[in-house]
Amino acid sequence: MKREDINMSAQNLTLLTDLYELTMMQGYFETQENQTVVFDVFFRDNPNKGGYSVMAGLDQVIDYIKNLNFSYEDVDYLRGLGLFSEDFLHYLSGFHFSGDIYAIPEGSVIFPREPLLKVVAPIMEAQLVETAILTILNHQCLIATKASRVVYAAQGDGIMEFGLRRAQGPDAGLYGARAAVIGGCVGTSNVLAGEMFDVPIMGTHAHSWIMTFKDEYTAFKEYARLYPDACTLLVDTYDTLKSGVPNAIRVFTEMRDAGIKPKSYGIRLDSGDLAYLSKKARKMLDDAGFQDAVIAASNDLDEFLIHDLKMQGAAISSWGVGTNLITSKDCPSFGGVYKLAAIQNADGEFQPKIKISENIEKITNPGNKTIYRIYDKETGMLRADLICFADETFNTGEDLLLFDPNATWKKTLLPGGTYTMRELLVPIFQHGECKYESPSVKEIAEFCRQEKETLWDETKRLFNPHKVYVDLSQKLYDTKTKLLNEAHH
């Protein structure tokens, strides 16, 4: 089956928008205000007070933009609302996206206030796509970030995404699984996600399997007969240490005596004191000669519980994480926003626009912008991100002064030749045509792993992480200050 045949995002989701996007579109249409504008997608805070986030969802955004068109049924439905003129509905019937989109590639580490995605398009088009872009990026960035935190807590152990049945619907389960693999999960229990995104699928069996048979030993024996190369047995249906683990050892012994060498085998704990039970089970398995048997665990895990279990010396090397990962239960929203940044004038120049707020964190950065990531040349570690105007250039052979835009006295001078720079925003659509070839999910996940290696451990830690600075160029800072001053006079 072709990917596009099963990809839910390849459906026509044109009406996946808020009503006010359409009423504003009609307003622009009627007043003939359809100048080219720049909108930025950004977020203000990392989830869970973390040190970074992970970019995900761009591939679904691409599919959404490619399939933008108002069907006959869409137009007829809108006509029935009694809100829209026939001239405007006629315009919608021939609608297609003709603008440009730039974005940070999926798997990148990202930070608050920097543009993740930039839309440069006639305002009617740019306004329409706001809602869908936000719902896609807000969801997948959130889950990829959560997965990355869980993976970090596991200290190299494998994390399996097990959350489909607790996800907020099929779409969240599917694209949440995709995002989780991008964030570092080794696989998912979600079979359709495996088919759609070519990611590993994995799982064991439920308590119902054991309860169906006359006893636990028989259930284990039959499962091992059916799946000898991937035999992980759930040992807590009746009594973990008195029944489950001994019966698992009995089956593993019979397999060994029969000359069967599984590619992977072990037990799964799904309840009780996981630290205590895993250490006891580990000793029982080791004493029986099964030192290479894996102990997996599940049971409402998250990064904090896994961190705590690791601190207690739990003998667990594989973790199934469901509800708390697929829903990001303790931080259920990402907070991405879509703000106007510039309007093109009659001369083709972009005039910076700024949104002002009493809350300093809600004041936007004006203009048609891009981002440069700055690395230490010797170590390759990330030093800072620099937001600047899209037409600004830099010479890495020259000194670069970085400063905190909210506390300008905090400054860092990078001597010329000691740093490198990489532009983060890449062209995705040009004049309505997709110019970007999305990597596979496996490639994105590997890129994400490499990205996180450029972060200091102090930034990745779960508690009180070190902040990565996102600074403004002097030119952008001066423009922002000028606009703020003008607005208050």
Positions of predicted regions on the chain:
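Glycine-rich phosphate/ribose-binding loops and adjacent secondary-structure elements
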Residues: S208-C388
